[in-house]
């Protein structure tokens, strides 16, 4: 009976797993394989195509538009990651302290994460286009009197603001979870040794929440490198392609620009870049944890 029961359980687990694996293969693995195959062709998204070997990959390194999108995306990812984690950590420290209504504040700060990125993007689009310039005119400020989204020098800052605003919520929750794992005994021992303020955070709190910091850093960099919805809602890559992210370029030129094969090669390279960066982040933060 025992063996039959175990075999029955295994069969049940197998029957549950097979549909999930099949769906994952059909909607994730298979498109990935087809994308890699198309990256070696001149496929336009329709009609016939010819094999071109590594030409698409070679052209990526000489295409100025691709280079510009990589520069913008990395600049956005670096700045947005720093802004998001600094603000999130400050908020987490405040919300983890003994204050009134902290549960209400935690819920309020999490609302941006519930909203869809496109919805948030369109709301901020209206804010940057109409509301902020109106305030700028009232205050007599020329820089604020015109929409940030119409300036090649300021549009990327608007994208950073929107990306950070929506990402801060989840990061704050993760940091709060990390802070709650720090034993009170550590702070009591630190207080005896005279640790207060910045020294308390630097030498006691931060080393103990390094794993949570690592998670936030990896998630932030990955999400910001793949930014798409905010670009679509705010600028559509403009003005003058100054806010064209890699994901938006792949979508725009691949789907409607007749560069399906070329942008498939771009997507493959981009995938490799994200994997390499994520592995490097985990390796560096892992070594940091061991040192601490």
Give short role names for the model-derived ranges.
Residues 3-292:
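A structural signal for multi-pass alpha-helical bundles of membrane permease subunits
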């Amino acid at each position: 009976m025992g063996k039959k029961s175990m075999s029955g359980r295994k069969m049940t687990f197998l029957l549950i797993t097979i549909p999930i694996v099949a769906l994952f293969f059909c909607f994730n693995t298979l498109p990935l394989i087809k994308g890699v195959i198309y990256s070696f062709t001149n496929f336009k998204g329709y009609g016939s195509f010819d094999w071109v070997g590594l030409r698409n990959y070679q052209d990526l390194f000489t295409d100025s538009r691709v280079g510009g999108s990589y520069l913008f995306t990395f600049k956005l990812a670096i700045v947005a990651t720093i802004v998001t984690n600094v603000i999130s950590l400050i908020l987490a420290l405040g919300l983890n302290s003994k204050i009134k209504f902290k549960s209400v504040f935690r819920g309020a700060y999490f609302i941006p994460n519930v909203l869809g990125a496109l919805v948030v993007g369109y709301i901020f689009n209206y804010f940057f286009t109409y509301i902020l310039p109106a305030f700028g005119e009232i205050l007599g400020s020329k820089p604020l009197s015109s929409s940030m989204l119409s300036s090649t020098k300021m549009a990327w800052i608007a994208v950073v603001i929107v990306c950070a605003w929506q990402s801060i919520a989840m990061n704050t929750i993760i940091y709060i979870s990390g802070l709650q794992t720090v034993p009170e005994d550590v702070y009591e021992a630190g207080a005896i040794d005279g640790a207060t303020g910045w020294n308390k955070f630097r030498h006691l709190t931060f080393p103990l929440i390094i794993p949570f910091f690592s998670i936030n850093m990896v998630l932030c960099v990955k999400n910001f490198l793949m930014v798409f919805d905010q670009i679509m809602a705010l600028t559509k890559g403009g003005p003058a392609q100054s806010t064209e992210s890699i994901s938006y370029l792949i979508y725009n030129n691949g789907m409607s620009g007749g560069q399906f094969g070329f942008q498939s090669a771009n997507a493959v390279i981009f995938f490799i870049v994200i994997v390499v960066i994520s592995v490097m982040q985990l390796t560096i933060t892992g070594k940091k944890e061991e040192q601490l």
